[in-house]
Each structure stands twice: as structure tokens, then as C-alpha cells.
Amino acid sequence: MSYYWVALVLFTAQAFSIEGDRSASYQEKCISRRLINHYQLNKEIFGVGMCDGNNENEFRQKRRIVPTFQGNPRPRGELLASKFHVNSYNFEQTNSLVGLVNKIAQEYLNKCPPVIYYDSFVEKSDGLILENLFKTIPITFYHGEINADYEAKNKRFTSHIDCNCKSYILFLSDPLMTRKILGPQTESRVVLVSRSTQWRLRDFLSSELSSNIVNLLVIGESLMADPMRERPYVLYTHKLYADGLGSNTPVVLTSWIKGALSRPHINLFPSKFQFGFAGHRFQISAANQPPFIFRIRTLDSSGMGQLRWDGVEFRLLTMISKRLNFSIDITETPTRSNTRGVVDTIQEQIIERTVDIGMSGIYITQERLMDSAMSVGHSPDCAAFITLASKALPKYRAIMGPFQWPVWVALICVYLGGIFPIVFTDRLTLSHLMGNWGEVENMFWYVFGMFTNAFSFTGKYSWSNTRKNSTRLLIGAYWLFTIIITSCYTGSIIAFVTLPAFPDTVDSVLDLLGLFFRVGTLNNGGWETWFQNSTHIPTSRLYKKMEFVGSVDEGIGNVTQSFFWNYAFLGSKAQLEYLVQSNFSDENISRRSALHLSEECFALFQIGFLFPRESVYKIKIDSMILLAQQSGLIAKINNEVSWVMQRSSSGRLLQASSSNSLREIIQEERQLTTADTEGMFLLMALGYFLGATALVSEIVGGITNKCRQIIKRSRKSAASSWSSASSGSMLRTNAEQLSHDKRKANRREAAEVAQKMSFGMRELNLTRATLREIYGSYGAPETDHGQLDIVHTEFPNSSAKLNNIEDEESREALESLQRLDEFMDQMDNDGNPSSHTFRIDN
């Protein structure tokens, strides 16, 4: 109770004191009227009304001081900021945004220097943001202004002038103009800072305008009811292909407030298409291009035509579609009149964006990358030549086949040139060879017999019986040389006949230029221009004589039907190999010929899918192709296609001829066939042909000579008749008439004897004259050999002349010639009708 009484006493005392203060009055000085008017003070507050007369400035009322604050008083800093129209909250928001942008630039954009774009509205209203950002950004950057039409004043920033990547930071009042400024961005990271509302930002992220900007981060300010508090910044991105229609949905990542992220573990640029394409259906244009795309037409049970596809690219894309959760709708590429090839038509469809993907074994080239995009190469291919090659050299070439033509030339020079040193060492002179072709012929047959072992010379006058050591050494060297050569020759013939000999094939550009081939290629698909400006000299020479055809079948037809000039066709090696395997066999072409693909690649290419430019699904499909290559799935697909589509009816894989496949022949022991020995028969047939030709020429020559004699005789008889008629007035005497008849009979008799003389007798007379020329000089003086055909020179038969001949062989030769002359005289007497006497029986 004592506590209550004490409190009551204190409260009563305080109440009385307050009442006393109110009743007490004190005099204060009044404020002058000049100060009140100058500072516009309240006259009622500053006590002007209480001052009267001359003492108006002597009293004023002091302001009552209350120690307890009531309400929410503003700090002095805020009061000063309001007086100078400075918003401290906006200043803090600016610093917060600058800190957020600096954090994003340092953590996500440091590898790719950012390009900062800002429009005129942001520059004028939020100029303090740009100023602070340019001063504090920790990495290298570019910046440029956007004009009123939302176009960058410096457009070079958006083009890649080098291989370095770029990123973008945009300060825009209208987020819908982002793609107009930057265009599609599938790889670069884009940060958009906008003052628009959250609803407008969500509309932008859901629209088609943001579908081509893959790595997009949008920063929007969250509006609150109390504008004096710090407002957070919300960070958005979008999810591409959220459903089967390919639409986008906005995604909230995190927020930024008080210098930190609410969820700092979140990646601000997450990977897209982690769950695929949500069953989206891609439109694909394809054309038949084996072995990459097979177009197979079949009939179902009802008789309706069915079209199905197969091949390396089809199976690869089907595998990727299952992994990325999308479906494909393949349509056959239509034929257009304004395009020259199927690939050009597919590229036009891609540029027009009527299809999403194009596949037809398309080569990745610089020209196609200018108007469209292509995937990474999934299969290698090369441009190769196809020619008509022989499986083996013909067997009739076995005679000349063992040696090349330089060896044959060297052998001919050695053996024909060996005539002169052998003759000179044996006779120590070459005078008897000059003009005597018979002796040269004998020596030729001698060296031919040495080489072929077909003849043996054991006569007294053969070189093998010579007594001179130099001749024997020379013949011995030729004999050793001949043994080695004949051994090589016979062994090579055996190998050539029993084993196949493969001819040279065309495997390079130099082979085509050296063998004078006609070369052709396609006039569409880029083949007509790819090698036009080549700096390779052989390629430029080859392109100058290039012929262009409309299809691959036409080119292969030119190869198989080439007759006088060989033809080579340049095309895809994979396609040519399949066409040869499926359409051409040994029976279709020849038993000895085959279509050959060059081993050397004329140009190496990579095959890929065709996409529209800046397509967002290209990067994901490229990553799957690289993964399939790394894991060996593409090699597995190639083997499966080869097994299913390129298998013969017997179960074996079809083989196209190449240098290796031509040589992959199982060798086995076998007997020689007629085809193996046809060279011998052809050689014999050649001999018969030459003999028949000589016989025909002799018959024609004999008939011609006979006709000439008849014509000459008729002319002489006509001339004699004319002379007799002209001299008919002059009569011959009996002696003159008898002499005239005798000469006439002798001429007729000589003509009949010459006609009866056979070919062998004439050659025997020629041989006798030749022997006289060779051996007659040893025992007889120089005689006129020009008269040998008229008068037979008598050889010396006395013992005195024979003693003058020292050489025994020469004496034997002269005796043989003498006996030959006697025999010839006897033959002449037998053929002379005047030597016989005919009696008439009475």
C-alpha cells in the first residue's frame, strides 16, 4: 500500500507543476517585421501580434520542446534530399542493378567480351546507371547506342569479325525489340535489362520473338506498394519447345536484393533441351542417294504403293529422334524446273523454311554454308574417278609380256650389234658384208639361234668352229648372256600364263592426264563449280577438258560404252561404289573388264544434315552426332546398312572393283587351258598370215610380170609387122632370111627355158653367185660379178693355182663350188632341147 501512496503523491505534484508553468508568463523579444517579410515567417507563431507600438520586437513566444517523437519523422538526410529533389531510394536501386550486372558479367560473360546496347530513353532517364556501370564493370566491353528505329548505330558489333565469341547486354524500354536489334542468337549469351512490367516480360519470353535466342537472361524490377523500400530484381529465362507445338514458357530463376541472389546455386544460363523437344514433329525433305538415303517403293496387300526410307542418314536421325524425344515426317523432294539438281531443291526449301531438315548425302561446302546451316560431318566421303579397267592382261601378250619394251629394244641392239664384232674378230674385215645381204641374213639367223636354241650350227664355216680366241671369248660372253636372258624369259612366261598379271589402273589425276582420258562429271549439285578455281595445276588442266552430264547413270554409261577414247567419271565414291555393286556385274560388262574406283581421293568431303540458318535445334543434334561418332554407333550403322542393303542373293557382300579387290583372287593349282596358251597359237597364226601375204604378193607379182611380157611381146610384134610392111619393097636374101629366122628361134627358145626354170633353180643360182663372191677372192683375181647371171666364171682347177691357196678351208670351198658348177651345167644341158637328138623311125 505504501507504494501506491508514493506514486499518487508524485503524480499530484507533477500535475500542479505543469499547471503552474502554463499560468506563468515571461517576456521575450519580438522578431522584426523586416525579417518576417524576408523569410516569409508565420506572423502568428513568431508573436508579431503580441508586440504593440514601439515595443513590438521586445517579446516573442519560445517553441515548446517535446522530448518524445510522435509518428515517423524523416531523417535530416531525407529532408535535404527532398529539398534538392534527390531520391535516395532510386540511388540505391541504381547501385543494386549495377552490382547485379557486374556479377553476371564477371561470372558468365568473362570469356566472351560483352557488347552493351542502350536506347535513348534509358540513356536520358537512367543515365546514372550507365555511368556507374561503365566505371565499375570488371571486364572488357563494347558499347553502342540504339536509334529511334531500334537499330544499332554501329552494326559491326553484331557481326563476327574474328573467331572470338561475343555476348550482349541490352538496356531496353521495350523488350520485344530484342531480336530486331540482335537477330537470332543460338550461341551467344544475351542479358536483357528492361523497365517493363513483369507481364510484358513474360509475354516476350512466351512469344516467337524469343524462340531464336537460346541463352537469354531477362532482368526485371519487381514493383512494390511502398516505393520507398528497396525493390528486388527478378531474373527470368525461357524453356524452348515446352510442348509438341514448339512453344516457349517463361521460367523464374532467382531474384537479386540487398546485393545477393536469393538462390545463388542456380545457373543463370542453364542448358536448354535437357528433356528433348517434347515430341515435336520435324518436317524433313529427302531424296534417293545410296548408301546414305534409300527410297524403297513397295506394294501393300491391297495394291497400294508404299514408300519407305532407309540408309545411313535415316537410321542415324531415327536414333537421335528417340534420344531427343521428337518425331520425323519425311517427304520426297519435289522436282522444280528452276533447279538443276535435287540438292539445290532441298536447299531452296531450307532457305524458304518450308522444311526443318534436309538429308540426301549432302556435302558440307562453303557455298552451302553461306545460305544455310549444316551439321557436323557424320560420314566421310570423297570425290573419286570410275574407269573401265582390265582384270588381267590378255594371254596373247605372254610372248611380249615378260619384258618391258626398253628391254626388248636393248636385246635387239645387243644381238644385232653382235654381228659386227663377231665377224670382225673371225675375218678381221667387214668388206664382205658390204652389199651382201645374204651373209647379213645368215648372221642374223645365227644370233637368233643363239637366243632361241632353235638352230645349231656345226658346219666347217660356223663361228663355233673358229680357231681365234677373241671370237671364242666373244661368243662365250654372248652364250652366258643368252642363258641368263632365256632363263628369265621362260620363267616369266610361266608365271605370266599360270598367274594373273594385273594391268595398271587409274588412281590419280596424273594418270588421267597421261593416258588421255575423257573426263566427265555432273552439271548440278555443285560438281560443276567446286574445282573451277583450283590452284592445283593438274586439277586446273583436268577441268579445262571436263564434260558435264545430267545424272550419275549417264556418266557410268559413258564409262562402260567407251570404245576409242577411254572415259572417266568423277563423282561420289560411296554412291558410285553402291551403283556398281547393285547394277553392274562381271557378266554385264566383260569377263576381263571391271569398273574400277580410284584409290586416291580427288577431294575429301564430309556429309551432314542441312538446317535453316540460326536454327536452335542444330546444336543439340550436332552434340548427338559427335557422341555417336565417339561411341562407334555410326560405324555400326554403316555396317548394318552394308549388310542389309548391299548384300547379294548368296549372302555375300557385293564387291566393287578396286586395286585391292582385283588382286584378292584365290590361287590354286590348275592345268593350262586354251586361253592360257592362246599366245602361241596367235603367233603361229601370225606366221601363216605373213606367209599367205607373201604368197599372194608373189602370185600377183608373177601375173603382173607375165602380163607385162605379153604386152611387150605384142608391142614388139606390132612394131616388127609395121617395119616389115614399111620395108616390104626390100626383099631379103636367102642368107639374111635364114639368119633372121635363127635369131627368132633362139629368142623364143630362151624365153621358154626361162619360163620352165623353177623358183628353186633361180635361188640356187643366186646362192652360187653369193658363194663365188665370198670365196672366189681367195684363189681368183677380181672379176666382174655383174656378169655372173650370164656367163659362169670357170674356177681354177689346176694344181698350180691350188698350191697358191694356203687355206685348206678355202680350197675345200672352191672344190665344192666347182662340183656345183658342173651340176648346174648338167642341169642346163638337160633343160636345153638342142642337146637332144630325136630320130624318126621309118
Swiss-Prot record:
Keyword line: Behavior, Cell membrane, Glycoprotein, Ion channel, Ion transport, Ligand-gated ion channel, Membrane, Receptor, Signal, Transmembrane, Transmembrane helix, Transport
One GO CC annotation = membrane
Residues in the signal sequence: 1-15
Q: List the disulfide bonds.
A: none
- How does gene deletion manifest? Strong disruption of larval thermotaxis when exposed to a thermal gradient ranging from 13.5 to 21.5 degrees Celsius with mutants unable to navigate away from cooler temperatures and toward warmer temperatures. Reduced response of dorsal organ cool cells to cooling. No effect on humidity preference.
Principal subcellular localization = membrane
Put simply, this protein is called: Ionotropic receptor 21a
Organism per entry:
Drosophila melanogaster
Its gene? Ir21a
